[in-house]
Design a protein with these regions (language model features):
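Amphipathic, Lys/Arg-enriched alpha-helical "gate/interface" segment within cytosolic domains
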Residues: 1-126
């Protein structure tokens, strides 16, 4: 599961939950491309605090989106906390996507600082 929220003129907060099977990854790509279609550039905070693992088949789907969006990306923060397998998956994704504009962070405050949105308040749902 995922949710995409606009948190600035060209910035988005993406919340992921559980696993990310290929059908969900493909729907996410469609939704994200539709939302960012008219934007020359954008930034994202991807909140993976409640994610478990990225499905193996979804890895390439997400990687393709990341590579295609490299030019338009301002900055992107991937929030991962205390999940070594997920951390490793995203390290591999970031290496393969080859962009210094992406970073793994440990909490939402670090993410906001990295993308330059310190004034935004993001409340976690429990």
């Amino acid at each position: 599961m995922y949710r995409i929220e606009k948190i600035g003129e060209n910035c988005f907060y993406i919340k992921t939950l559980g696993t990310f099977p290929p059908s969900v990854a493909e729907r996410f790509i469609q939704d994200f491309n539709e939302i960012t279609k008219g934007l020359p550039e954008f930034c994202t905070i991807i909140d993976n605090l409640d994610a478990i693992l990225l499905d193996v088949h979804s890895f390439n789907i997400i990687l393709d989106l990341m590579i295609k969006s490299n030019e338009r990306l301002i900055k992107s923060a991937f929030v991962i906390s205390q999940n070594p397998p997920l951390d490793k998956e995203f390290q591999l994704l970031l290496e393969k996507a080859a962009s210094p504009k992406r970073k793994i962070v440990r909490n939402l405050e670090e993410a906001k600082k990295w993308v330059g949105l310190e004034d935004i308040i993001i409340q976690r749902e429990d």
